[in-house]
């Protein structure tokens, strides 16, 4: 059994902390929350400290933040219905653009692999795709109204311009740009959860997706592409996503976030029961019928709901979490 070792407990925000995001280099992270502020933290020696506080970009709670793949830009999604884009061009972080269009709370934001596209989603049930048109210029490329309820999360595929979204309507949807007319289309709907899908994450290759839900389960989905050797039909030459594994019984409340480590293959969850759990694929797992086991769990990782978990993209086995209890914690998975 592995163990989850607590390395750091950090405080600074007032009220609940909604989101944390590692910088691509792994030596900096950002956090956001109820206090309408973003904090940028960096590591010097063995100490994490706040280097910058960005407090003038939003009028309401900041729900999520994400670094661009190049690490130069930070996007923040807020309950004030806007998404702000920050960069450090002059040595200090500044808000360079504010993206408006959603009717109410923006719940999630995600950069595409190239950094050329940005996706946002909202309680208004829509997903917006923005093109980065140049210096601090963002143009709306698509407004996607495929979901019937609040959209909780958007995540880009790790290698392709395919977007996944998760919703209060219990489904996950995939979107891609049509080869014919450059319109964005919904190419797949993933239905198996019986309640809100809170979060999703792709594996390193992007052929599998993990989802977590209010129904207290984790699900693993696999993409079957046209011409696949499993004999799965692919109508309209679109990839089909099938649920190939369901993990239940480990969580006692809603699972709010999930992160699939691109370095180790481990899956981490943040739960409404205050716990963090780590899952790994078993050694005898099959491609079309994968099996996962719980490697370790920290049942009282936080004193209240765990809102976000994210694996460090550059340091294998390092995990960050944040909570309604107003703390950020950094963990290390040890053998």
UniProtKB/Swiss-Prot annotation:
Signal peptide: none annotated. PANTHER family: CYTOSOLIC IRON-SULFUR PROTEIN ASSEMBLY PROTEIN CIAO1-RELATED, WD40 PROTEIN CIAO1. GO terms for biological process: iron-sulfur cluster assembly; protein maturation. InterPro entries: CIAO1/Cia1 (IPR028608), G-protein_beta_WD-40_rep (IPR020472), WD40/YVTN_repeat-like_dom_sf (IPR015943), WD40_repeat_CS (IPR019775), WD40_repeat_dom_sf (IPR036322), WD40_rpt (IPR001680). GO terms for cellular component: cytosolic [4Fe-4S] assembly targeting complex; metallochaperone complex. It comes from Drosophila persimilis. Belongs to the WD repeat CIA1 family. Keywords: Repeat, WD repeat. Essential component of the cytosolic iron-sulfur (Fe/S) protein assembly machinery. Required for the maturation of extramitochondrial Fe/S proteins. WD repeats lie at residues 12-51, 57-96, 101-140, 146-185, 192-231, 250-289, 301-335. This is Probable cytosolic iron-sulfur protein assembly protein Ciao1. It comes from the Eukaryota.
């Amino acid at each position: 059994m592995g163990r989850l070792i607590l390395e750091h407990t950090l405080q600074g925000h007032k009220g609940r902390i909604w989101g944390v995001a590692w910088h691509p280099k792994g030596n900096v992270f950002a956090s956001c929350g109820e206090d309408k502020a973003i904090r940028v933290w960096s590591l010097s020696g063995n100490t994490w400290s706040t280097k910058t506080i960005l407090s003038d970009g939003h009028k309401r709670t900041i729900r999520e933040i994400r670094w661009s793949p190049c690490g130069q830009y930070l996007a923040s999604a807020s309950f004030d219905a806007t998404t702000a884009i920050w960069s450090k061009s002059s040595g200090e972080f500044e808000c360079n653009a504010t993206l408006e269009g959603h009717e109410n709370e923006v719940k999630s934001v995600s950069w595409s692999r190239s950094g050329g596209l940005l996706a946002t989603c909202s309680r208004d049930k829509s997903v917006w795709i923005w093109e980065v048109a140049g210096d601090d210029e963002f143009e709306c490329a698509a407004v996607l109204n495929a979901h019937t309820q609040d959209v909780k999360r958007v995540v880009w595929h790790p290698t392709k311009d395919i977007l996944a979204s998760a919703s209060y309507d219990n489904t996950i949807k995939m979107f891609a740009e049509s080869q014919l007319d450059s319109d964005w289309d919904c190419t797949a709907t993933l239905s198996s959860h019986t309640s809100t899908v809170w979060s999703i994450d792709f594996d390193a290759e992007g052929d599998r997706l993990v989802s977590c839900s209010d129904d207290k389960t984790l699900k693993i989905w696999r993409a079957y592409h046209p011409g696949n050797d499993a004999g799965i039909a692919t109508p309209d030459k679109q990839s089909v996503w099938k649920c190939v594994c369901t993990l239940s019984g480990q969580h006692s409340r809603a699972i709010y976030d999930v992160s699939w480590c691109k370095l180790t293959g481990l899956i981490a969850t943040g739960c409404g029961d205050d716990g963090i759990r780590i899952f790994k694929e078993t050694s005898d797992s099959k491609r079309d019928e994968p099996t996962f086991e719980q490697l370790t769990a920290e049942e009282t990782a936080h004193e209240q709901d765990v809102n976000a978990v994210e694996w460090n993209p550059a340091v294998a086995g390092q995990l960050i979490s944040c909570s309604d209890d107003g703390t950020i914690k950094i963990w290390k998975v040890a053998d």
